[in-house]
Amino acid sequence: MKVLHVCSEFYPLLKTGGLADVVGALPAAQKAIGDDARILIPAYPAIWRGIPDTVVVAEFDNFAGHVTLRYGIYNGVGVYLIDAPHLYAREGNPYHDQWYNDYADNYKRFGLLGWVASELALGLDFWWQAEVVHAHDWHAGLASAYLAAKGHPAKSVFTIHNLAYQGKFAARHLIELGLPVDMFNVNGLELYGEISYLKAGLFYSDMVTTVSPTYAKEITTTEFGYGLQGLLSTLDQQNRLAGVLNGVDDSIWHPNNDPYIHHHYKLKSMSGKAKNKALLQERFNLPQNPNVPVFVMITRLTEQKGVDLLLQCADEIVNQGGQLMILGSGAPHLQDWVNWLASQHPDNVGVWIGYDEPLSHLMVAGGDVILVPSRFEPCGLTQLYGLKYGTLPLVRKTGGLADTVVDSSAENIKARRATGFVFNNAEPEALRHCIQRVFSLWSKQRTWFTVRTVAMEQDFGWRVAAHRYHELYNKI
């Protein structure tokens, strides 16, 4: 099946969020199971640098000016680049300038992305014609609208990575974009008097997916729907809304071949984990003690990530003799709070403000518990890394966290299902009780190792997601 992924970023060439990780891994996994997956992306400077060797597929003029469509290969995956320097030759963030002002021509920049996607389903490339156009987030949302306007020449799938960003622009741009005027309708791409590229993707796609089954249900509610819960509920009732879990890229995140850690290990040879733990304690200037549980948190320091919940009950970790290590940056008041906590407990708490890729890998490899107490989390990746590395996730029951971590209740441990720790309510006392359960299990090392083994046996690789998407494509 010929699948075209339409996106505005992909790892490792250009990344601002989790969307890039998905598009950087899913097409290769799809190729591995027999689908012919390719990528369409604007030719930003970072993309050009990563794919310097291309051939011209087509040249044309349309509402966006003069455009050249090019084709190259990156890590074995075919990539179409939309070469329009007047729109895309801007360094840095693909969406806004250095002062965080959205580019005024974003409606045109991402309108062109959707338009080219639809044309690749109509034969713009003589040698390859998309059978499925799989658009990602609002930037690619108009692809589905253009396909609908052109008679549905291909199946259309739209994946929500972040529902909060809705790509809203003035209604006057509709005619310039070449879309039918009657699409500007509540039963169309209109949202509160504006064009919404996100809503276009939702309304006109054959199938809408998001990054976990639980989050797919949550976004049909007022709490998580960002004003689109009515449309999303309708899609759910029509069986046009599904959740497909993100995967983990084993070439980057696997304890047996992780390029960033010194001591590799695997399920039947775990000595390297203890060595990584000692290195981690040294890195954070904490006492090197193998007998205390190490809690790690790698996150943006925001309330959404539940950082404030943790800080209100971090004393539970300290008082029971555990160690807490935090890596991240974000809200200034939370940064001040974590720094204060570390200053008060220099033998128990270590903090690194900022981001450090090698350190994040060492924390996952050397920790015993990875904390993800988010208020909401569409999918989450750090808990998946924790499972793979035998660093038990402690998570709140929401979104993808609920779909990927099984609580260490007595019943689940006995049935060999338990893989971590789960709490329900976004309240400090609920998290405190969960931390107490961690220490209880830690005191029973044999049982701890059993849970750790089950955690490491879980398979959340991209191949699983690729098969799930193949099934969805065939259902359309």
UniProtKB/Swiss-Prot annotation:
Its taxonomic path starts at:
Bacteria, Pseudomonadati, Pseudomonadota, Gammaproteobacteria, Pasteurellales
This chain's function reads: Synthesizes alpha-1,4-glucan chains using ADP-glucose.
EC numbers, comma separated: 2.4.1.21
Which pathway is recorded for this entry? Glycan biosynthesis; glycogen biosynthesis
Alphabetized UniProt keyword annotations? Glycogen biosynthesis, Glycosyltransferase, Transferase
Presence of keyword Transferase: yes
Q: Where does ADP-alpha-D-glucose bind?
A: K15
Q: What is this protein called?
A: Glycogen synthase
> Per its UniProt record, what InterPro entries does this chain match?
Glyco_trans_1, GS/SS, Starch_synth_cat_dom
Q: Which GO terms describe its molecular function?
A: alpha-1,4-glucan glucosyltransferase (ADP-glucose donor) activity; alpha-1,4-glucan glucosyltransferase (UDP-glucose donor) activity
Q: What organism does this protein naturally occur in? A: Actinobacillus succinogenes (strain ATCC 55618 / DSM 22257 / CCUG 43843 / 130Z)
Highest taxon in the source lineage? Bacteria
Family, similarity comment: Belongs to the glycosyltransferase 1 family. Bacterial/plant glycogen synthase subfamily.
Q: Which SUPFAM superfamilies does the entry mention?
A: UDP-Glycosyltransferase/glycogen phosphorylase
Gene name in the database record: glgA
Any Gene Ontology biological process: glycogen biosynthetic process
Q: Which GO terms describe its cellular component?
A: cytosol
